[in-house]
Amino acid sequence: MDKMKSYIYFFTIACIIAVIYCVLVNLLQINVIPVVLAFSLILILTISTINKKIAHKMEDIEVLFMLLVLAFFAYAIYKLYIPV
């Protein structure tokens, strides 16, 4: 149970950082609102994992979510440094 909680806490921290990064990129007038909404939804799902069954499923697909956060950072850097 403690291992599961630590995974959820780490993932929550990663989502919070991703949302903050999205807001900062958006302040530079680059439209990343859909990404902010997606990560906000994931953050809400992560924080609301009170049900043990849902928490175990989140633990099972944790690596996928971490890859999603990594892909988000790559996308944000692409939008920030390579203008269209």
Curated annotation (Swiss-Prot):
Main location per the UniProt record: membrane
Query: This protein's superkingdom?
Result: Archaea
Membrane topology type: Multi-pass membrane protein
Show the stretches that span the lipid bilayer.
8-28, 30-50, 63-83
Where found in the cell?
Cell membrane
Instruction: Look up the record and report any one GO term of the cellular component aspect.
Output: plasma membrane
> Which keywords does UniProt give here?
Cell membrane, Membrane, Transmembrane, Transmembrane helix
- UniProt-recorded name of the protein: Uncharacterized protein MJ0519
Q: What is the lineage of its organism?
A: Archaea, Methanobacteriati, Methanobacteriota, Methanomada group, Methanococci
